[in-house]
Amino acid sequence: MDLSPTQRQLEIRDGVTTVLAAHGASESDVPVSPEPGYDPGLWSELVSSGWVTVGFPEALGGRGGELSDLVVVGEALGNGPVMSPFHGGIVLCGQALLAAAGGGERLRALLAGERTFTYCNWEGFDQPGETQPNVVASESRSGWQLDGSARLVPYGADVDELLVMAHVRAGEQQGPTLFAVPGSSSGLMTNPVPTIGGDRCSDVAFSRVEVDASHVVGEVGQATEWLPRVIDVGRVVIAAEMVGAAAGALSHATHWASTRVQFNAAIGSLQAVQHRLADAFIDVVTAQDSVYDAAGIIDRGEEARVAAAEAKAYCSDACRRVTAAAHQIWGGEGIYSDQPLHLWHRRVAALVPILGSVRNLRSIVAASVLSDSGAQ
């Protein structure tokens, strides 16, 4: 199987890189605005240029293409490294609005940059029977009332609407349902939570939050019919961001090893350093292959739950090894905040727990293996 990038994907990568370079989002300078936790000008340019809307139908405001194209964008943003609402706002929310009935209007607004969204309380719903309902929706006079809480919602205090997965308990209507809750809703409270990646995350509480029927996305109680595939896509794109960050750290460490002189020779001439760099290179390449393999499976319309879990679990471990090796090569210089190495390290660390820990992802793979062996 040929996993090398296509000409279109190379053009997408070059396009994203050009926008990042124009805004100073490079290895030596990564601007981050404290409000809303990313550079709004850069994000606006990425949206208006259409690079972050690849993989979505042109009829709905996207740029067309496949999931593999979104993976290229994620990899380029991770390589920046750039904090943005890409995987949460565009990928996860966009794919949910695309998959759920009646999400077209909101999807158009998202892809046009007219409205911002984030996901809330989604984790675990792709594993039926394993999730306790943190947010519950019950019928009310105006439509629906939401109560409960969710942790670590990315940009939860800054978006126009939160796409909240809630468990409906209303007569015959039961089960997970997606609600688009305005960020300004009465009874919705946010509490900022600092993260290692610097993303603006918040714990969100819902206390008698009222929304009408127009804020139900898709069919009531039927979210699990389409959510697993959306989670698969999210895991693959997040893994791609980790690969990009690891590749950035490796490139920086390689340059350092070739220019840092000790005892009248570049430290890259030492075999121990060469071995570290070689191992890190293998980790980056194999992680990248796992991502593109999983993306290809999704693009072909095949069942991708195991492949997506494998890709994210492997990338979580491999990319952390790469950033750790880069720090060892840089030595004490690598811990200074005026050096960019810690940014790639933080980016990987922040992405690892999203949409399932390594342990949980491996349990998905293990269950599949045991099921297959039992069937034989």
Residue ranges of predicted features:
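A short core secondary-structure module
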Residues: 149-188
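A structural signal for short hydrophobic beta-strand segments in well-ordered beta-sheet cores
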Residues: 135-138
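Structural signature of FAD isoalloxazine-binding scaffolds in flavoprotein oxidoreductases
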Residues: 64-73, 111, 129-133, 181, ...
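Flexible, small-/acidic-enriched active-site or ligand-binding loops
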Residues: 132-133, 152-153, 182-219
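Internal helix-loop-helix
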Residues: 48-108, 155-158
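A generic structural signal for well-ordered coil/turn residues at beta-strand boundaries
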Residues: 113-115, 131-133, 158-160, 175, ...
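A short, Trp-centered hydrophobic/proline-enriched beta-strand micro-motif
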Residues: 113-124, 164
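Alpha-helical interface subdomain recognition
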Residues: 1-78, 232-376
